Structures are given as C-alpha cells and as structure tokens.
Amino acid sequence: MAKASRDTLYAPLRLPRVYNLLQSLTGGSRDRADFVKRHVLFRSDEKVVDAGCGTGSALEFLPPVKYVGFDPNSGYIHAAQSRYGSRGQFLCGDADSSEVWELVQSADTFLSFGVLHHLTDSQIRKILSLAQRCLRQSGRFIFYEPCFSARDDVLGRICMNLDRGGNIKTDQAWRALLSEYFATLEEHLRRPVYWFRYTIQAFICRDPRQL
C-alpha cells in the first residue's frame, strides 16, 4: 500500500480515543502485558523510558517504577498526562529532541512496544542509538514488534502487509539491526497474536555496544 493511501486510511488513529479503542479491540495491550509478566522483572527504583509511549497504556500493566514516556503526537501525550500523570513524566518529542535526551539519561530500561515499524529506517536507528547511549551499562532494551517470518499465519501476513506502520521487517532483519547496538539478545517469537494473527518478535536486549 502506498504511503499516502496508508496515511489517509489510518488518519483517525491519530486521535487518542480511536487509538485506544483499536488497541482494546485487537488485544494488543493484553499480549504486551502477558509478555512483560512472563519475561520482564522490574524494581521499584528502576528508571523506565517508554519510547513512543502513545497514550501511556503500558502503565496499565507496569508495576510502580520511575516512568518516563515520550511521543511526537501531542494528542497522545495530553491523553497520557490526563490519565496517568501521577505515575510518571510525559514529554511531547522524538529522539532528536534535546529535552528528551536530557530526560532519559541513565535509564535502566527502554521500552519500544510496537513503535519502530511505524518509523523510517533513519528514525528507527535514532531510537536505538538513543537507547544505546542513554542506558546504564547494566540496562536493557525491550523490543516488541510485528515481523515477517517463515511460519506466519496466512491471515496474519495479509494483515501485516496492510498495517498502519509501513516498515515491518523480517525476523532476520530485526535481529541483525538490534545486534548492531546490543551484544546480547534474548529472543521470543509469539504467534499468532491479536485478532489479526500477527507474528510478534520480542527481544530483551542487553549489553549496549560501546561507541
């Protein structure tokens, strides 16, 4: 699908209420919550950065932590502040923002839940570089994205080709990209996920590579 057509079709999802409704209907938040519950432990004093936090829905399943979320959509950030303002800090901006850079320093965990496939390759690398530079050496990058793989559900592959984000990669491509920034990758493939039967590739990435 051409980018202009995709942007027009999915324009309503830029509205926080529409976005939240779709997440609820498709079960996206439920699978993310299940992945975190099974594989990711948090300390109460941990600084957690949510890159592309959207409306802050990750706070529905995160335990109490020192939460920082950023997103370039001002409507999403306003909705997040209205609902979760007492539980963390929210900033409207992207990986190029100096304010974001200052706020995310010395993070223990970076989260990227279904964000990167909505970005260009250049923007994806900026997010990964931000995490690489701002994580503590003992920190981790939590990656959760749809991917194309050899065992995709037929409906899932069709839906992924029609996804709002136009940059879904193969499992090999995501793995190779992440390995440029992190030395240790713990991988979890989840399929089929959501009503749309996506294949989801999740990683817990550790040991940021030294620049």
Question: Which residues does each predicted region cover?
Answer:
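Short, surface-exposed basic-aromatic patches at helix termini and helix-loop junctions that form
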Residues: 133
